[in-house]
Amino acid sequence: MNVSQQIEPRAAASERNMADAIRFLSMDAVEKANSGHPGMPMGMADAVTVLFNRFIRIDPSLPDWPDRDRFVLSAGHGSMLLYSLHHLIGFADMPMAELSSFRQLGSKTAGHPEYGHALGIETTTGPLGQGISTAVGMAMAEQMMASRFGSALCNHFTYVVAGDGCLQEGISHEAIDLAGHLKLRKLVVLWDDNRISIDGSTDLSTSMNQLARFRAASWDAQAVDGHDPEAVAKALERARRTRKPSLIACRTRIGKGAASMEGSHKTHGAALGDKEIAATREKLGWPHPPFFVPPEIRAAWAKVAARGRTAREAWDIRLDASRSKKRYEQTIRRQFDGELGDLLAKFRSAHRTRATKVATRQASQMALEVINGATALTIGGSADLTGSNLTMTSQTQPISPGNFKGRYLHYGIREHGMAAAMNGIALHGGFIPYGGTFLVFSDYARGAMRLSALMGLPVIYVLTHDSIGLGEDGPTHQPVEHLAMLRATPNLNVFRPADIIETAECWEIALGEKNTPSVLALSRQALPMLRRTEGNENQSALGAYVLREARGNRDITILATGSEVEIAVAAAERLQAEEGIAAAVVSMPCWEKFEVQDLAYRRKVLGDAPRIAIEAAGRLGWDRWMGPDGAFVGMTGFGASAPAGDLYRHFGITADHVVAEALELLRRAYSETLPIGARIGPHPSAHTVRSSQEA
């Protein structure tokens, strides 16, 4: 049976009335809120009605049905289009009261769609270009799942509504190029080609031939009248048959139907006003009061939900009959085998015995070799830095056009597109994506990384070459402010491990996260194994811990992360040997994990002695751990081009400098009357902090 035979025909007149319901709900909600964007929902109501009424398979009674079609409103400012649809097809959490509470505190109808805030919202959109780029990841995941479980269990489309702004954003170029290369044939983008931007006509800023652009990227591209239901339906039928991703340029008029403002940029981001809405009701023959939908139109929309429910029930039968049911359900839930934790514990024990000295990026690859061998859930990748990020292992064969059985994506030099695609893979379900680039290039991925955190997605960012330790490539490639930027992001774990033991621990934590993305900031340079104590406890899970306790009562505490923990240990040993100063070293691989520990633990780790912090990055954020009188050894500006060792010496990030700073800190904290080599005891106002052996 061909596609057209599978699609139930609908009368255009009925669809016009169904579309008008979207228009008036959108107008009414924006008017009541006196805030919002009515123009896009009004303009795209006709095309989206055809999509939902004839094609899309969604079951509102089971919104997370794994084989549902995905609908992504990339032009998220038109959120009332989505909320109106959800109300009309019967999502339980979208009664009319929610529409009338649009953009109000505590409502389900936020200004832009937010994943997890209401049922059926596939991804958070609003930053233009993110939705279409995230949808590329969803389409990838669909193809990967289909290659593993067959079309009987995984056979759905990803539909996107994108606007002019989405296609102007740079991330769209990355996503479109990658989707075309991979031939993501179940990705269909309906472009709201209204040629209007906030400032006015789009010809103020662009002359782009978007159809030619998409065709150049190996997409199928069509142009239709977006207000002609049969033309839209015919284009969708073709899109569902093609072997490429599809663009349907829907030529529309923003604010379609408005009495006097149709086609005006003024309908984009403001309420139309009582008079304009009243005139529009008269023009379109809609005599109903605000927030009212006639029963016959509700009945028409209810058929959309019924069709979706029928499709879902048929899928349930296929799943129950499948020999792969258990494996499928474990995969879609991202359920690990229990042996992974044991394997990583053995890994740590073996390398502790060997005292393995490697760069933490290499330690990451070694840990990934264990992880990827123990689970098939992980999907790796890199933005054209595989050999530097070391994100590929023996189990991760590349994914290529027509072959989605692999477990590794060559994203190309598309950091932002990679991050958004990983969001889409995570949102789809079935996989845990990780992807690599240099830490400094997190700038390019920032928009999508922020959405990872906002949505609470278990995406893992492998960000290597994490400091001036990368050396000769110079300040363009040396991150200074990036750790502070990432740590300032809510709900993002930033791990900076000090050695192979901590690296394996950080991977274990990241893989266990259900609602938080992770960053692994990893070194280029080799680092010694520092954790010599035996035990299976994952100390990095505490965020910070005492790596080296002082001999006796602490005189000073040295805090550090990553490659600078080695420097902290060397400085502590010199302070003890040369100055008789008892120094403890605290490794802080994850501030976010440390700050959620109880107060007693944090006090025990940090102690009451003066503190000095070391990190080959900017100071911002460290004062909360150092205290008001602490000292910082790190970067105060951009780096330089030179061998790594020379740079550490040039910028004073050395054990010598730490010792000097520690002595000065102690002089200020206690008394300048003591000889430099004298035994300096605890601060008179401080509580005595005993070593772990004495506690």
Curated annotation (Swiss-Prot):
The active site is at E415. One of its GO terms (biological process) is reductive pentose-phosphate cycle. The keyword Transmembrane helix does not apply. SUPFAM superfamilies: Thiamin diphosphate-binding fold (THDP-binding), TK C-terminal domain-like. One of its GO terms (molecular function) is metal ion binding. Pathway: Carbohydrate biosynthesis; Calvin cycle. It comes from the Bacteria. The keyword Calcium applies. Substrate binds at H37, H268, R361, S388, H465, D473, R524. Mg(2+) binds at D164, N194, I196. It catalyses: D-sedoheptulose 7-phosphate + D-glyceraldehyde 3-phosphate = aldehydo-D-ribose 5-phosphate + D-xylulose 5-phosphate. The record marks H37, H268 as: Important for catalytic activity. It is an enzyme of class 2 (transferase). Its EC number is 2.2.1.1. SMART domains: Transket_pyr. Binds 1 Mg(2+) ion per subunit. Can also utilize other divalent metal cations, such as Ca(2+), Mn(2+) and Co(2+). GO terms for cellular component: cytosol. Pfam families: Transket_pyr, Transketolase_C_1, Transketolase_N. Thiamine diphosphate binds at H77, G126, P127, L128, G165, N194, H268, F441. Homodimer. Catalyzes the transfer of a two-carbon ketol group from a ketose donor to an aldose acceptor, via a covalent intermediate with the cofactor thiamine pyrophosphate. Belongs to the transketolase family. This is Transketolase. It comes from Sinorhizobium medicae (strain WSM419) (Ensifer medicae).
